[in-house]
Structure formats: structure tokens, C-alpha cells
């Protein structure tokens, strides 16, 4: 009775003329404050009016449409299981539900009252400290019941470890918003990455006209933007999504004169945000922590000499001074460089032909390459000095803690396969950046998981390219409040670790996971369906060490994107849950051999809530598809 009165009070003014059309239906639904997909409302409205051959509905039709869109049988079943009168949940009944089903073992009574006050829309019911079915729907559909743990939505990890102890959200070719040959360079690439919590940006610097450096994909037809404009964007957005340090990874192709200009822009625009000297002792034996570097911007570039030598020059005018960096270039025909893909391949090049060889060809003779660096720019490099990777043995013997390596995707994959223990040992000491192979002209991405498995901190992806790799990236870095830094597991931080992702042995910490896939709600209509009648299925995927990789697929529900019901349970045993991600992918079965992507959600396995949860869905481009969701029950131990 109270629900009916509440409902009529909200909508009855809309029916003063007896009947309403589709637009008025949408406006009334908005007054009820429950999100809806317009395509589904259109579909239900059309089914209603088609019966009568008219284009308006009465108040009872509207009630039926509202219930079809908002009231869910699966919610009603749970509600009735705990409500003695099947009309309202008393605070004690809600407390019992929270304890038994949602595992709120502490403070359940307080939480129950908070839920009632926050979600109960009917005044009389709320005053009695009860929850109506309308309130229960609103609670179960809310952020408080999403599958991502509430505790992990803010920074909860220890942020006082050295920088090398964290996975760091990193982008590759940040300035591009499409492909790498003729696409535009765009400041929006930097804005978008920073707003997503990215903490390492790549800036490709080249000589520009009027002594003004430009940013673009060298030797290609991509458009150019000024370095100055990029730094202004960094200054504005660096800490919009996270307080923790931003690293500017310079891919520097500039003359020393324009390198001087780069240094001036960094100093003048970023001001106090730019880190220009070490924190604490000048002699650096350990990298500082993200906490110590809050609101700081670091420059990653080649550097002349040591930090100590830089500080001795402090205060001296180094304008016009240059230094020289020498490094051995040991190349073989499968060697990758961080050089950009030219528009036209050089004739006679054997690089591309040899990428598929099963065994590496003999190494060629080492050449010594010398590069000139403006001292003004060199001195801005403090904790992120770019150092060419020679070998794990060389790094262990000679590399300083603030020297970082960039390793190409193909070489890194070989290390993962043949020298995983050494790779883990290396990344426990030094920040290591992985970048995509040069042949990815379309800005495609590799699977980042295999490099996270060995502790690589900066696994750089093309943020502009949608697909599973970026979904894994976005899902992983949801953790720790989305701040862009995630503390690596202890076995990837410990310098004496013998962890190997291919044979986890004593590092196994098995977790048994059970997920009951109950239903879907207002799934996005298929792009290939004109009738709004998708045939949805859900694929559950585990990403982690090779032993943990798994895929399970639900049955197909025919012709129902509005409210498909599965009630299927999937079980997994995960050996290294600390590295695992779980991905829910919803597809429309087009044929026996083809499916159309409808939406997905990825999150760290250890960020799963327990109990009844909604799984929000995201589009290919990473946009939220609200109110599209899955409804699941999660249990693990």
C-alpha cells in the first residue's frame, strides 16, 4: 500500500490528460531515479503499444514498463527470503542478510541503518527503520554492492617503499590518438592518460622550427604538437587523478640547442613540481618512495655522470654546456630498438624477416655510440636515468639504483621464457620499462600480464588502442584507489627471491574461487541486432601466471538482453592470486563461430568482494555502460 501510494505520488501528475507518449514516459522514469537504457525502454514501450495499435499508454501500462525495467525477479527472491511479511525488511532482517550473504561480520547493525537511511525512498518506511523492495533494489544496484572491494577504492597500500617496488601505470606514444604512421598527434592523448591515472608518459622530442621542439612520431606523417604545449598540459593535469609522482619519459632526438629549450620549458612551466635535486642525502643508495615524491614530476632521459656530480654543479650556469654519453650498441638481426617505425622500410633490412626465428642469430660486433646531451637537461634527470640494457649480469655488477632500462617486447618475451628468475631479480632492483615492438604500426598492444608476472614496473601500452590488453591495464590499476602505483607482491620485491612464473613452487598460495553467474541487466543491445534481441553469453577469464590462465563460458540465453538469467556456477583454483586478474566479458552469439562484444569488466582477483555483487560493464573504449551489469554471487577462501 505504501509503495503504491509513493509510486502514484511521483507519477500521477504526468497522467492528468489520461495517457502519455514515449517522451513523457522517459521523463517520468527519470523522476523515479533509477538508471535505464533508452533502447530497452523503447523496446518495452513498443511491445506495449503494439498490442493496441496506438502510441500512448495509461498509468497501468507505465507501472508495467517500470517493473519490467527496474523490478528484478532475482532481487525479489532474495528479498522474500529475508522478509517475513514479504513487503518490507525490518532492520534486524536486513542485518541478518548483511551478515549471512554479504559477510559484513563487523558493524552489520550500523551498516543496516546506514543502508535504510541512504536508499529507502519511502518516507514512512524509512522512519520505521525498514527497507521496502524499492529501497532494496536501489541498494543492490548501488556502488555499495559492486564487485570491486570498497576498501580498495582508496589508497590502502604502504606507499613508503622504493619506487622500484611498485607496478607503475605507463603509456607508450602518449601523444598519438590513432595509428603510428599518419595519425594525429594530440594533446588529448596526454590529458586522457593522466585522467586515467597514468603515471609515466612518453614524449617523443624532435627539432622544430624557430628553435621550438616538437612532439610527434619521427620519420612518419603523424602531425606535430609543440613540446611547450605538452608540458602545459602536464602541468595542468598531472595530479588531477592521483597525488603520486609522474615520470616524463623523453624519447630525445633533439639537437643540444633544442635540448636546452626543453630544459627551460620544464623548469619555467612546471616550477616547484619538477624534481631538480635528490630528496635527503646526495649519495643515492635507494630510490625514494611514491609518498616522498608526492606531487613531483620526474624527467626520464639520458644523463651525463652521476647525481653526485650533478649536485656539485648546482647553482652554476650550465647554459650552452654539453656532455657526451657513450654506450655500446650490440646488435643482432632480431635486436629491437626504441626507434620509431619509419614510413618506408629501408631496403635490404633483415630486421622484419628475422623476428620469427626460433633461435637468435649470432651477436654482431659491439659499436660504441656517442650522444651529445645538453647539461641543462642532463641535470634535470635525478632518479630516472635511462641506461641501455646490456645483460642481467652487467646490471647487477654496474647499474646504480636510479638507472632504468627500457627493453623491447620481443627481447623481454625471450627473457620471460628463458631467464625468468634473472628477470625477477633484475626488476627487484631496477625500474624496467617494456615497450611495444616497432612493427606495431597500427598501435596494437601486447599482453602486459607476462611482464607483470616478472615484476616489470613500467609496462607501457598504447592507451589509445582499445582491446583486452588495455582492459587488463585498466582493471589492474583500479586497485589502490586508481593512484597509478600498485605495491608488487613480496616475492617480486625481495632481492633473494627465486620466484619463477613458469614454476611457482613454494610461492604458491592457492585460492579457491566460486562465482555464481545469476543474471544480466539491461545489457547493451548488439550492434548487429535490429530487434534489440541479443543472445548473450558470459565468458569468465583468469589472467596471471601461466598455470592460472583459465577461461569458462556460460550458456547462451536466446533473445534477451534486458534480463537474461543463467544461474550457473564457475569454480577456479588460483595458485598465485597476488598476480591474477579476472575478466567478465559479455558477448552476443551471432553464429556458432562468431560473437559480438557487448561489454566487459576486469579487476584484480584480490579486489573481489564476497556475496551478492553487481558487475558494471564497460565498452571497448573504456566508457561505463550504465546501467548494464551482471549479477553474481562470489565466494573464495
From Swiss-Prot:
A GO molecular-function annotation: phosphatidylinositol-3-phosphate binding
Sequence ranges of Acidic residues compositional bias: 324-338
Enzyme class at the top of the EC tree: hydrolase
Pfam families according to UniProt: C2 (PF00168), EF-hand_like (PF09279), PI-PLC-X (PF00388), PI-PLC-Y (PF00387)
One cellular component term from this protein's GO annotations in UniProt: perinuclear region of cytoplasm
SMART domains noted in UniProt: C2, PLCXc, PLCYc
Predominant location: nucleus
InterPro entries linked to this entry: C2_dom (IPR000008), C2_domain_sf (IPR035892), EF-hand-dom_pair (IPR011992), PI-PLC_fam (IPR001192), PLC-like_Pdiesterase_TIM-brl (IPR017946), PLC_EF-hand-like (IPR015359), PLipase_C_PInositol-sp_X_dom (IPR000909), PLipase_C_Pinositol-sp_Y (IPR001711)
Region of interest (Disordered), ranges: 310-369
Domain C2, chain residue ranges per copy: 493-619
Cofactor(s) demanded: Ca(2+)
Compartments, as annotated in UniProt: Nucleus; Cytoplasm, Perinuclear region
Name listed for the protein in its UniProt record: 1-phosphatidylinositol 4,5-bisphosphate phosphodiesterase zeta-1
Amino acid at each position: 500500500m505504501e509503495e503504491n501510494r509513493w509510486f502514484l505520488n511521483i507519477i500521477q501528475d504526468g497522467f492528468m490528460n489520461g495517457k502519455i507518449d514515449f517522451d513523457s514516459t522517459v521523463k517520468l522514469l527519470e523522476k523515479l531515479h533509477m538508471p535505464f537504457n533508452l533502447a530497452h525502454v523503447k523496446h518495452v514501450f513498443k511491445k506495449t503499444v503494439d498490442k493496441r495499435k496506438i502510441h500512448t499508454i495509461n498509468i497501468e501500462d507505465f507501472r508495467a514498463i517500470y517493473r519490467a525495467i527496474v523490478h528484478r525477479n532475482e532481487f525479489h527472491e532474495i528479498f522474500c527470503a529475508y522478509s517475513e511479511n514479504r513487503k518490507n525488511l525490518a532492520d534486524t532482517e536486513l542485518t541478518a542478510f548483511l551478515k549471512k550473504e554479504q559477510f559484513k561480520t563487523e558493524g552489520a547493525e550500523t551498516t543496516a541503518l546506514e543502508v535504510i537511511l541512504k536508499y529507502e525512498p519511502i518516507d514512512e518506511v524509512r522512519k520505521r527503520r525498514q527497507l521496502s523492495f524499492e529501497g532494496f533494489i536501489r541498494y543492490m544496484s548501488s556502488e555499495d554492492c559492486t564487485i570491486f572491494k570498497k576498501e580498495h577504492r582508496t589508497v590502502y597500500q604502504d606507499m613508503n617503499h622504493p619506487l622500484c617496488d611498485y607496478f607503475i601505470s605507463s603509456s607508450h606514444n602518449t601523444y598519438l590518438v590513432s595509428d603510428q604512421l599518419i595519425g594525429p598527434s594530440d594533446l588529448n592523448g596526454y590529458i586522457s592518460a593522466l585522467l586515467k591515472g597514468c603515471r609515466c608518459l612518453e614524449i617523443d622530442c624532435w627539432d622544430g622550427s624557430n628553435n621550438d621542439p616538437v612532439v610527434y612520431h619521427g620519420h612518419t606523417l603523424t602531425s606535430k604538437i609543440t613540446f611547450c604545449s605538452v608540458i602545459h598540459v602536464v602541468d595542468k593535469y598531472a595530479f588531477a587523478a592521483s597525488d603520486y609522482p609522474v615520470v616524463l619519459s623523453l624519447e630525445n632526438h633533439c639537437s643540444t640547442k633544442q635540448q636546452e629549450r626543453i630544459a627551460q620549458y620544464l623548469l619555467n612551466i612546471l616550477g616547484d613540481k619538477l624534481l631538480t635535486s635528490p630528496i635527503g642525502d646526495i649519495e643515492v643508495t635507494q630510490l625514494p618512495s611514491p609518498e616522498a615524491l608526492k606531487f613531483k614530476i620526474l624527467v626520464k632521459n639520458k644523463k651525463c655522470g652521476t647525481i653526485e656530480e650533478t649536485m656539485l654543479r648546482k647553482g652554476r650556469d650550465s647554459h650552452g654546456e654539453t656532455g657526451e654519453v657513450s654506450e655500446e650498441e650490440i646488435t643482432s638481426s632480431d635486436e629491437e630498438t626504441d626507434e620509431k617505425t619509419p614510413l618506408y622500410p629501408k631496403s635490404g633490412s633483415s630486421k622484419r624477416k628475422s623476428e620469427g626465428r626460433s633461435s637468435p642469430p649470432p651477436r654482431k660486433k659491439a659499436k660504441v655510440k656517442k650522444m651529445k646531451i645538453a647539461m641543462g637537461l642532463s641535470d634535470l634527470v635525478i632518479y630516472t636515468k635511462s641506461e641501455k640494457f646490456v645483460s642481467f649480469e652487467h646490471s647487477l655488477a654496474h647499474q646504480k639504483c636510479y638507472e632504468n632500462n627500457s627493453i623491447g617486447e620481443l627481447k623481454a618475451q625471450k627473457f620471460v621464457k628463458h631467464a625468468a628468475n634473472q628477470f625477477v631479480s633484475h626488476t627487484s632492483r631496477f625500474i624496467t620499462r617494456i615497450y611495444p615492438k616497432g612493427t606495431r604500426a597500427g598501435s596494437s598492444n601486447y599482453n602486459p600480464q607476462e611482464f607483470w608476472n616478472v615484476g616489470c614496473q613500467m609496462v607501457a601500452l598504447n592507451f589509445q588502442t582499445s582491446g583486452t590488453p588495455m582492459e587488463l591495464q585498466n582493471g589492474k590499476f583500479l586497485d589502490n584507489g586508481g593512484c597509478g602505483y600498485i605495491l608488487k607482491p613480496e616475492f617480486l620485491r625481495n632481492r633473494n627471491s627465486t620466484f619463477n612464473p613458469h614454476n611457482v613452487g613454494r610461492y604458491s598460495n592457492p585460492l579457491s574461487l566460486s562465482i555464481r553467474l545469476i543474471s544480466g541487466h539491461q545489457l547493451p543491445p548488439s550492434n548487429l541486432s535490429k530487434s534489440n534481441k541479443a543472445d548473450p553469453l558470459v565468458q569468465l577469464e583468469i589472467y596471471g601466471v601461466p598455470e592460472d590462465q583459465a577461461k569458462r563460458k556460460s550458456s547462451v540465453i536466446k533473445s534477451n538482453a534486458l534480463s537474461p538469467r543463467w544461474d550457473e556456477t564457475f569454480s577456479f583454483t588460483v595458485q598465485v592470486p597476488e598476480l591474477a586478474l579476472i575478466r567478465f566479458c559479455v558477448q552476443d552469439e551471432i553464429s556458432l563461430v562468431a560473437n559480438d562484444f557487448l561489454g566487459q569488466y576486469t579487476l584484480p582477483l584480490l579486489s573481489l568482494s564476497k556475496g551478492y555483487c553487481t558487475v558494471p560493464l564497460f565498452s571497448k573504449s573504456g566508457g561505463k555502460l550504465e546501467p548494464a551489469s551482471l549479477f553474481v554471487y562470489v565466494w573464495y577462501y
